[in-house]
């Protein structure tokens, strides 16, 4: 079984954590933007059936 040789420094741990958080932020921003475009009817990537 692989065992890490040395303890990861606090700064490296913080950098990795921030990268992980940033990915989540951008994903949520994209999802919000897509939801907004769907609700306003400006979406070019989805075909939404509108009931009249």
Swiss-Prot record:
Belongs to the bacterial ribosomal protein bL32 family. It comes from Capsella bursa-pastoris (Shepherd's purse). Coiled coil: none annotated. It comes from the Eukaryota. This is Large ribosomal subunit protein bL32c. InterPro entries: Ribosomal_bL32 (IPR002677), Ribosomal_bL32_plant/cyanobact (IPR044958), Ribosomal_zn-bd (IPR011332). GO terms for biological process: translation. Its main location: plastid. GO terms for cellular component: chloroplast; large ribosomal subunit. PANTHER family: 50S RIBOSOMAL PROTEIN L32, CHLOROPLASTIC, LARGE RIBOSOMAL SUBUNIT PROTEIN BL32C. GO terms for molecular function: structural constituent of ribosome. Keywords: Chloroplast, Plastid, Ribonucleoprotein, Ribosomal protein. It is found in: Plastid, Chloroplast. The keyword Ribonucleoprotein applies.
């Amino acid at each position: 079984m692989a065992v890490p040789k040395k303890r990861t420094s606090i700064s490296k741990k913080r950098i990795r954590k921030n990268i992980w958080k940033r990915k989540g932020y951008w994903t949520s921003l994209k999802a919000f933007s897509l939801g907004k475009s769907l609700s306003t009817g400006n979406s070019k990537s989805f075909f939404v059936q509108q009931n009249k």
